[in-house]
Amino acid sequence: MERYIIKDGKKLRYGYTTGSCATAASKAAAQMLLQPGEVHEVDIDTPKGWSLKLKVEDIQRSHGAVSCAIIKDAGDDPDVTNKLAIYSKLIWRQDTKIEIHGGEGVGTVTRPGLQIPVGKPAINPIPLQMIEREVREVIGPGRGVDIVISVPKGQEVAKKTFNPKLGIQGGISILGTSGIVEPMSEEAMKDSLALELPMAKAEKIKTFVFVPGNYGRDMAREKYKIHDKNMIKISNFVGFMMDQSVIQNVERILIIGHIGKLVKVAGGIFHTHSKVADGRREILAAHLAALGASQQLVLRVLESNTTEEAVGLIQEKGFDRLFSHLADKITEKCVERTQGNIEIGTIIFSMEQGVLAHCSQAGRLLEILKSEGVKDE
């Protein structure tokens, strides 16, 4: 596929989804059910509006059935499913139905909260629609087929995806709302993160612990003994996950994170990646000045190389009260973002000093977590 996008000054190639692969393989197999020859290329339309012409691989015929594969091409996206063979086998039915099944390497949904019912193969609604539309167009209204989608290496690759955490067992998911993989797409990561909220709510989780990454997760586990099922790694998408929490009617959120990440939220920055905004030293300095710190300390913090260095300078001058002030400010900003619909607390830490501060609500949320029985004793 030769379409490109420019990101951060780099020319990156688009790819196509597992859903497009499954659709193309199914269409090619349907064409070969109706004719004796082999189909070596197949065209499909994607929801994005782009047409794809894909090479058909590993054609196998048996009485009343055809199987073939399409090789997944993720373009320049770092996708663990890249180069996987996505197979579709079509078998004539006696009626006019089209039934789509999951075979080897396609996961099975085991927990509620996803778009797919428990017990069904992890083939998302858009790919299901794409497959049925393309196959029906080929075979017409008067015939029916069973379609089995399989991914021979899917079970192994699935261990590197979100699937185990989402309760999808035994393989990968057949995905793709647009049919196209946009390289280095934040939207794909956001979609995965957003899935975790309804799934946890389906398991009666009421108090969530948001951590930006592994450091926050480790602190939550080791210091506060918080169970993994309550934790969601939100990466840099603080604002997005707050918005999703409102949509999902989340009751309570405790945020646990490194000061270098969360101090940005105190300044109203809800996407915390450095390419979007930084301002860490400036925010620290502004709040120090507001609390009456000396000009010398403010200037030294502005000139510091890292947040860890700034924390050391602040503690050296006995200005530790800044940290509880910041924790309260982070909470205040998140409450404003969620329009007061969610009870929120914040805990901030540094790598060298450990926990720096709890906001005024954090202790209450820790007690609620304990009373809900989600902390390991």
Swiss-Prot record:
Family: Belongs to the CbiD family.
Pathway, per record: Cofactor biosynthesis; adenosylcobalamin biosynthesis; cob(II)yrinate a,c-diamide from sirohydrochlorin (anaerobic route): step 6/10
Catalytic activity of the protein: Co-precorrin-5B + S-adenosyl-L-methionine = Co-precorrin-6A + S-adenosyl-L-homocysteine
GO biological process, one term: methylation
Entry GO MF terms: cobalt-precorrin-5B C1-methyltransferase activity
Protein name from the UniProt record: Cobalt-precorrin-5B C(1)-methyltransferase
UniProt keyword annotations, A-Z: Cobalamin biosynthesis, Methyltransferase, S-adenosyl-L-methionine, Transferase
PANTHER family xref list: COBALT-PRECORRIN-5B C(1)-METHYLTRANSFERASE (PTHR35863:SF1)
Cross-referenced Pfam families: CbiD
The organism's place on the tree of life at top rank: Bacteria
Listed EC numbers: 2.1.1.195
Upper classification of the organism: Bacteria, Bacillati, Bacillota, Clostridia, Peptostreptococcales
